[in-house]
Amino acid sequence: MDRRAEFKRWKAQCLSKADFSRKGCVDEDVVEIVQLLNGREQFFTTSSCAGRIILLEQGMDSLEVQKQNCCWLLVSHKPCVKDDVIVALKKANGDAILKFEPLVLHVQCRQLQDAQILHSVAIDSGFRNSGITVGKRGKTMLAVRSTHGLEVPLSHKGKLMVTEEYIDFLLKIANHKMEENKKRIERFYNCLQLALEKETTTTNSHPKEKIKEKNNSYKKKSNPGKAHDKCVTEENDKVLENDDDDDPGISVTIFPEDY
Amino acid sequence: MDRRAEFKRWKAQCLSKADFSRKGCVDEDVVEIVQLLNGREQFFTTSSCAGRIILLEQGMDSLEVQKQNCCWLLVSHKPCVKDDVIVALKKANGDAILKFEPLVLHVQCRQLQDAQILHSVAIDSGFRNSGITVGKRGKTMLAVRSTHGLEVPLSHKGKLMVTEEYIDFLLKIANHKMEENKKRIERFYNCLQLALEKETTTTNSHPKEKIKEKNNSYKKKSNPGKAHDKCVTEENDKVLENDDDDDPGISVTIFPEDY
């Protein structure tokens, strides 16, 4: 079977299976992206989480980081208030940790070129920790990830280590990150639509035109005069995150010019 | 110029340049890995940070997440004690955030196959957020990243929001994560050595042998009888992290068999 047919078969097989997540369905905020991707023959999504605030409990001691002993006290895909956390914390007698986790999306791609397009969209939308995985036999996946998290230990052996005022302050930050994450998801959707439209146009155009067109797309510095580049906003650069390459604290040698 | 010669030229150019990081040199814990990679013709490192505890100050309000207003109050590549943070916090009149950031390493690779080998080594060593980037003209980079972070807001508009006891508790966790990160770096170095040795052996062996050998390497489930697979320890799986695919909270459809 050729690669194209093989991918098609896998996709059909994957999408016909039940959703094995605890929730059992795709998160509301990411449904449009999942549908857009699964509607294209070169992609299918294998896992997704739109972003969430979670309160985890780890065994009896967070210094013994055993995954087996971890349970969830609270999971919310919507903004939370202090009382949600206070109530959930009552169930904890180990070490409770509050986390904000941004969008995570895994997409299987027919070929490397498809993953590259999706990767550009992800980076341009602010998901800077995204990356491609290529398996030994060529299975190509894109993981969409952000650096925009939060991970705060709250209690130790059942004892609350912070004040209620602090939890309130923390949730304001977590909710704000959730909003920012939502904006990025919207940006991702818009960028993706443009990229896929462009892809369709170039696929149908003359081969020479196609090459020319390809070389012009996904410029890091967008030309404000070009409507199709508008998804690359400067907003991305204003948000504080672990932007590794810009970070003066990381040992850096000059990159050769982009090729 | 062919790709091989082009890569060689870029590498020479990159490694001859000064280190533009604030520190001006490669972190001690990652020197061996950097040297091992740069000693191979198919790789060169472009940035690295072994892992660190940092105290950042963000403008006057962490809800206005402007990167421009961010400054560093403390950076440590070694374990910290409470007083280090207390002293540094005295300089803050905005919003201070304590972070633990694990190893970050960017490696430019001659071809995709080289990045795949390095990616396997990274994943097997516990750096699960690692990923490949392929530029429009084929520039291939591997980013080594872990999920093993910590990000805790400590003060708001200059006011400390937590107790000293909490800071002490937090640093125990951060220091523990630093230790775990160090173990993973060692694991990465050992795995990398084995992978590169194997690569050399297979490159020099008969082509048919080479293919056979390649298909046997980097098994997820290692065969305990085989010495060359010993770098894949079960330890990795015990550590609590955002292991996206295992997470029952993430909408998941069945992966087609690895190919």
Swiss-Prot record, chains A, B:
Keyword Disulfide bond in record: no
Gene3D superfamilies: tRNA wybutosine-synthesizing-like
Pfam families linked: TYW3
GO terms, biological process: tRNA methylation; wybutosine biosynthetic process
Disulfide bonds: none
Reactions the enzyme catalyzes: 4-demethyl-7-[(3S)-3-amino-3-carboxypropyl]wyosine(37) in tRNA(Phe) + S-adenosyl-L-methionine = 7-[(3S)-3-amino-3-carboxypropyl]wyosine(37) in tRNA(Phe) + S-adenosyl-L-homocysteine + H(+)
Entry EC number(s): 2.1.1.282
Gene Ontology CC: cytoplasm
Annotated region described as Disordered, given as residue ranges: 200-259
Keyword field contains Calcium: no
Keywords: Methyltransferase, S-adenosyl-L-methionine, Transferase, tRNA processing
Root EC class: transferase
GO molecular function, one term: tRNA methyltransferase activity
Pathway: tRNA modification; wybutosine-tRNA(Phe) biosynthesis
Skewed-composition ranges (Basic and acidic residues): 200-216, 226-241
Similarity comment: family membership: Belongs to the TYW3 family.
Biological function: Probable S-adenosyl-L-methionine-dependent methyltransferase that acts as a component of the wybutosine biosynthesis pathway. Wybutosine is a hyper modified guanosine with a tricyclic base found at the 3'-position adjacent to the anticodon of eukaryotic phenylalanine tRNA.
This protein's name: tRNA wybutosine-synthesizing protein 3 homolog
Organism: Sus scrofa
